[in-house]
């Protein structure tokens, strides 16, 4: 049975009713549903094995974004995040996108760089040539360290050698092992290979190896998403669709040329991506580092997305960025909710997960720019933030929605106002 990711009136249900609906829709087991329904999904013994000095666990809201259709397949997207409006915006933009076939995605092979720094070299150019002449020997040695990866079709594929003739510490070489890590994020794999080949590289060059470490600029491991939106889909009561498109294009141009704006623009993209990375137990710091480094690849920090108008006057958005995520290893395997997230997504490869991530990032970027180009970011965001303010003020149950409605109606979304409203409702 194919999944329909549209969830009409889903937000009006209670959390328990939402979970029941998702459980039935996806055919989740009783144990899966219990993981989400009850606190303590991460047992203390597992948490204690993940990091050091554990004294407890920390919970964040776990939601699903609806309406996503990616390469013709409907997907419910688990998102773990504390900020209001992210899930709503992504879901609404996905609803607009699906009217034109949803998101189209693709990705390159899961190739990661392992860097080996070699210092103390008097003739870097000749040392570089010496390494390249013995490339096959180096690759063969690296691949001896992970026979399982080789059996799965992965392994070290190539080496590159970069020379830096003038550094604060004199000339140096940096060799890159190019490793196909298959469905792993790949950090441990490539680090092990880098350490394995270090003695051989020292012998070949006569230099001294210092750092042996992966690079988080995974610019060979790219994922891409594209979306097309018609003017009719973007029109509001106050703005024509054409006017909204022009506003979005101006907003994009701002991010393309101004790093101050680009930083916030790209943060909005990561608002969609990071919650999925967290939900699947992947390393969101690695994804963030790669994203912002990639945004500087031209020598100027700019927008990760591009937006343009096609010959039919439709808005076309594209996001291409590094996406080093995995399905095996680390918290992805140890955290029970990370495993459940992968089952909800229905992904079988790391590349499929990467493509969903960039689709969500593109949707989030569209939502932010649409708001900025029309009503401003605060109107919609603060309406959703009002519920959070109500909870902070002490509202419970039905009080939350009542206080939030009052805050929004009078355009006064502040904690002290929420406290006053709550006292009023309780007759205090």
Curated annotation (Swiss-Prot):
InterPro entries: HMG_CoA_Rdtase, HMG_CoA_Rdtase_bac-typ, HMG_CoA_Rdtase_cat_sf, HMG_CoA_Rdtase_CS, HMG_CoA_Rdtase_NAD(P)-bd_sf, HMG_CoA_Rdtase_sub-bd_dom_sf. GO terms for molecular function: hydroxymethylglutaryl-CoA reductase (NADH) activity; hydroxymethylglutaryl-CoA reductase (NADPH) activity. CDD domains: HMG-CoA_reductase_classII. Changing residue 381 to A/N/Q/K: Reduced activity. Its EC number is 1.1.1.88. Gene3D superfamilies: 1.10.8.660, 3-hydroxy-3-methylglutaryl-coenzyme A Reductase, Chain A, domain 2 (3.90.770.10). It catalyses: (R)-mevalonate + 2 NAD(+) + CoA = (3S)-3-hydroxy-3-methylglutaryl-CoA + 2 NADH + 2 H(+). GO terms for biological process: coenzyme A metabolic process. Belongs to the HMG-CoA reductase family. This is 3-hydroxy-3-methylglutaryl-coenzyme A reductase.
């Amino acid at each position: 049975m194919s999944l329909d990711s549209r969830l009409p009136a889903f937000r009006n249900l209670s959390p328990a009713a939402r979970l029941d609906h998702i459980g039935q829709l996806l055919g989740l087991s009783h144990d899966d549903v219990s993981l989400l329904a009850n606190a303590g999904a991460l047992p203390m013994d597992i948490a204690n094995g993940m990091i050091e000095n554990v004294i407890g666990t920390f919970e964040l809201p776990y939601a699903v974004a609806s309406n996503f259709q990616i390469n013709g397949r409907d997907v419910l997207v688990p998102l773990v995040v504390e900020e209001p409006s992210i899930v709503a915006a992504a879901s609404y933009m996905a609803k607009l996108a699906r009217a034109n076939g949803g998101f189209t995605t693709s990705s390159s092979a899961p190739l990661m760089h392992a860097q080996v720094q070699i210092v103390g070299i008097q003739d870097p150019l000749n040392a570089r040539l010496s390494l390249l002449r013995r490339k096959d020997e180096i690759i063969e040695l690296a691949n001896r360290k992970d026979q399982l990866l080789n059996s799965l079709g992965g392994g070290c594929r190539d080496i590159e050698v970069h020379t830096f003739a003038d550094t604060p510490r004199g000339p140096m070489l940096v060799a890159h092992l190019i490793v196909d890590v298959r469905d792993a994020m790949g950090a441990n794999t490539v680090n092990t290979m880098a350490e394995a080949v270090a003695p051989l590289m020292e012998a070949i060059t006569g230099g001294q190896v210092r750092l042996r470490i992966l690079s988080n600029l995974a610019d060979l491991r790219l994922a891409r998403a594209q979306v097309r939106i018609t003017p009719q889909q973007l029109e509001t009561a106050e703005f024509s669709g054409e006017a909204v498109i022009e506003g979005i294009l101006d907003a994009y141009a701002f991010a393309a040329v101004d790093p101050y704006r680009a930083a916030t623009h790209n943060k909005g993209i990561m608002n969609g991506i990071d919650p999925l990375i967290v939900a699947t137990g992947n390393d969101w710091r690695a994804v963030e580092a790669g994203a912002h480094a990639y945004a500087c690849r031209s020598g100027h920090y700019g927008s990760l997305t591009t937006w343009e108008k096609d010959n039919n006057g439709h808005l076309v958005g594209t996001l291409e960025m590094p996406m080093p995520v995995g399905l095996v290893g680390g918290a992805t395997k140890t955290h029970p909710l990370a495993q459940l997230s992968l089952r909800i997504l229905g992904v079988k490869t790391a590349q499929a997960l990467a493509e969903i991530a960039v689709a969500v990032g593109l949707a989030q970027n569209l939502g932010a720019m649409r708001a900025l180009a029309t009503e401003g970011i605060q109107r919609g965001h603060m309406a959703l933030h009002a519920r959070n303010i109500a909870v902070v003020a002490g509202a419970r149950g039905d009080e939350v929605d009542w206080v939030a409605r009052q805050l929004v109606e009078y355009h006064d979304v502040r904690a002290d106002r929420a406290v006053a409203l709550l006292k009023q409702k309780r007759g205090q």
